[in-house]
Amino acid sequence: MEAVIQTRGLLSLPTKPIGVRSQLQPSHGLKQRLFAAKPRNLHGLSLSFNGHKKFQTFEPTLHGISISHKERSTEFICKAEAAAAGDGAVFGEGDSAAVVASPKIFGVEVATLKKIIPLGLMFFCILFNYTILRDTKDVLVVTAKGSSAEIIPFLKTWVNLPMAIGFMLLYTKLSNVLSKKALFYTVIVPFIIYFGAFGFVMYPLSNYIHPEALADKLLTTLGPRFMGPIAILRIWSFCLFYVMAELWGSVVVSVLFWGFANQITTVDEAKKFYPLFGLGANVALIFSGRTVKYFSNLRKNLGPGVDGWAVSLKAMMSIVVGMGLAICLLYWWVNRYVPLPTRSKNKKEKPKMGTMESLKFLVSSPYIRDLATLVVAYGISINLVEVTWKSKLKAQFPSPNEYSAFMGDFSTCTGVATFTMMLLSQYVFNKYGWGVAAKITPTVLLLTGVAFFSLILFGGPFAPLVAKLGMTPLLAAVYVGALQNIFSKSAKYSLFDPCKEMAYIPLDEDTKVKGKAAIDVVCNPLGKSGGALIQQFMILSFGSLANSTPYLGMILLVIVTAWLAAAKSLEGQFNSLRSEEELEKEMERASSVKIPVVSQDESGNGSLGESPSSSPEKSAPTNL
């Protein structure tokens, strides 16, 4: 009689135990027996040795299977060997040999560190560049001749959003025809080339390539209320830099880096290390903030007739190009030396879809819709507060040097605050789980946003108190708005971004790739552009940004409420997908090992590899 049991060990009763021990070492795994140059003389894990039981809990009568006294007295050796299905592990290297554990450093396996350290360095380089680009783009477009802060809402709505949609469509097409490696290099290399060309070619030639005369004629014809749209034409190369800097944040950070991180990490590793990725990233914020501050002071100390922006841009763009090349090198190293984790093979393979089919599929998915709600809600909420704050900042620091220096300090403070939040985030994930972590960011943004709007609305009564602190109401609003942005962005980097990226991991590859492209490249600018559209509508309706402040506060409350509802819905779907994935993996591990239970021969010992056709004289089954 022969049966098959779904288990992880091979239970065999050798016919000739003494002879078999010299030929077949059960303690050796299949891999060792096939490939080892010299078989090691290791004893297997024996349940009995020369008739004496090693494990007192082992009983000869199990679940109705009767074994005679003669059979019990027969001397035999029963050894259990791990089949090592799937993972290649060897169970039981004998009494004197312990199971070899993976080497660890500070309690973390070396194989895991080979992923985490390069990913942390990549995140450092990416956010170092992003901080420099983010601080520089505002100064370029706001302080340029013939431009002002009014250009920003128009840029986000009518330039940045169409560019983001166009990139998403192109990225979706490329993802169907290129490998992951080729797609990564195809996307990031044009960014590196452009930023180098801007610092060394486009900016020095800006006086020749900007249509100043045409812009002046249009401004005279259309009137000053169209100064924002006309400024886009007037300083088109600066606006292109602004858009490319915005796309660096949404494309390189969200799509390329997090997509790569999701590809090579498991959910358990993500829960433990995703919040810590930001530690290196926020050290980058601190250093890049100091870099911007240094070049701001350098421009201030240059002699007359020297274009400070030209000098500083060449230096900063050189740093950006160097960091970009370092990102490519780290990506190559990880792909070369770090193995990919095994994923569940039972997931449905999605067919290749066109652009419209992809969009329809993503819109029809409640999971993707909730993710999109999170991203759009954050973009609108932070934009409603941030643009108002930047208008106050422009009024307080009209000089480019002062504006840039303040932004450098702001980035440094953001890095310090986020670094602290990163240290606390792992505790939040371990103690309270994904759902609570996802709800902290909207709560922080709501509370700090209310404080900022309240100071603007009721700044008059607070003027005497603010004067005692040596500040004007305008400067106080600038500082409170800065604190609001610092707390909101630190919560975003330490909790919101890891939560969002962890939500992609249980998805199948097709939904993961195209969903990230649609959400991160389109929904992120859509949130910013949506906030800009709301502000433009309010300004046109109520005459000024100050008059529309109470209504902006009410809109902020509604959006954050929808954000919290989407986070709650996504929490349930995420936990359900995780449970399904774990169940599939367990089933794969169980089904990959089939263990034959062999019969006994006349000597009372089992025979290994007996076929069903064996004669009954040679095989006497036990009594059931």
From Swiss-Prot:
One Gene Ontology term of the molecular function aspect: ATP binding
Disulphide bonds in the chain: none
Compartments where found: Plastid, Chloroplast membrane
Domain of life: Eukaryota
Location of N-acetylalanine modifications: A80
Membrane topology: Multi-pass membrane protein
Gene Ontology CC, one term: mitochondrion
Any single Pfam family the record assigns to this protein: TLC
Low complexity bias: start-end ranges: 602-624
Keyword field: Acetylation, ATP-binding, Chloroplast, Membrane, Nucleotide-binding, Plastid, Transit peptide, Transmembrane, Transmembrane helix, Transport
Chain intervals for the UniProt region annotation (Disordered): 579-624
Transit peptide as recorded in UniProt: 1-79
Transmembrane stretches, start-end: 108-128, 182-202, 240-260, 315-335, 446-466, 545-565
Family, per entry: Belongs to the ADP/ATP translocase tlc (TC 2.A.12.2) family.
Biological function: May function as an ATP importer.
Protein name: ADP,ATP carrier protein 1, chloroplastic
Organism listed in the record: Arabidopsis thaliana
Species classification: Eukaryota, Viridiplantae, Streptophyta, Embryophyta, Tracheophyta
